[in-house]
Amino acid sequence: MFKHYLITRFNLKNKNWDVTKNNETLLTREWMTHRIGLFSNFCLPSVASQINTNFKWLLFFDATTDADFKTEIEALLKPYPHFKAFYIDGMDAFHSSIKSYITDDSKNTPYIITSRIDNDDCIHKDYISTIQQQFKSQDFMAIDILKGYSLQVSPDIMLGKKEHIFNPFISLIEKNETPKTVWFSDHNMWKKESRRIEIANQRLWMSIIHEKNKVNEFDGYDNVSWDDIKTDFIVSDEINSKVSKNIIPHKEWRYLSLKNKLYVNYVLMSKKLKKAVGLYKIK
């Protein structure tokens, strides 16, 4: 009835994206080493631990990726035959490469689902199952999971709740007739789309905040126990141990928590109101 593709971009060259939030150059060997570390510790184990394995993970790397990094990537993905690496000519070739593979792979399949995840983030073990449960043979329907967590891993470790509408974990159900795929537009452009389902009863993603994020800052809130969620968000044993031992107690950042809670909920309500009254352009 459908085929489901989880899609991730990695080190694709982009003329509009060349520095971190700390003004450090992106896509250097140092950057790549750090990013593969995040990927192998957070993103990969969370995707590999999905209860539902009826999907393919398409990962797109730049064609200029150094040979030693390619070897490391292939070794990481080798245990998982439904995880596939592609080496392409930068961001300019990204969307066309997605469509080319899916067109060939999904022949005679009436519907497709495409989901996105950043290479340094994490998903709940039921993420794929929950997305597929929304499938009702819709010709075009975006799925926006509003609730998740924010985990800062450096310089200090903090964990909190987070809400984010039109977020980077969005999915798209489509009839398989020249499908656009979820990556045809940036995630924040889904505010213009009227054909959209919101899932607000589960926290199904975890945004990882680190010093080399392009834009994100830690804005988690409330007292969340790592022990309560670590069996749902699977990370490496090394990271699990590190977080368990070094997480800062909520009482030590209570003021920041309150500030973040007010800010996150203000932004959420503001965007919902703008959507409701039609301030965003509706397609």
Task: Name each model-derived stretch.
Residues 19-30, 34, 61-113:
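Active-site-proximal specificity loops/subdomain of glycosyltransferases
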Residues 119:
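Short acidic donor-binding/metal-coordinating loop in glycosyltransferase active sites
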Residues 3-8, 46-47, 55-60:
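Hydrophobic targeting segments
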Residues 5-22, 62, 146:
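Short loop/turn segments at strand-loop or loop-helix junctions that form parts
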Residues 1, 7, 174-283:
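C-terminal catalytic/acceptor-binding lobe
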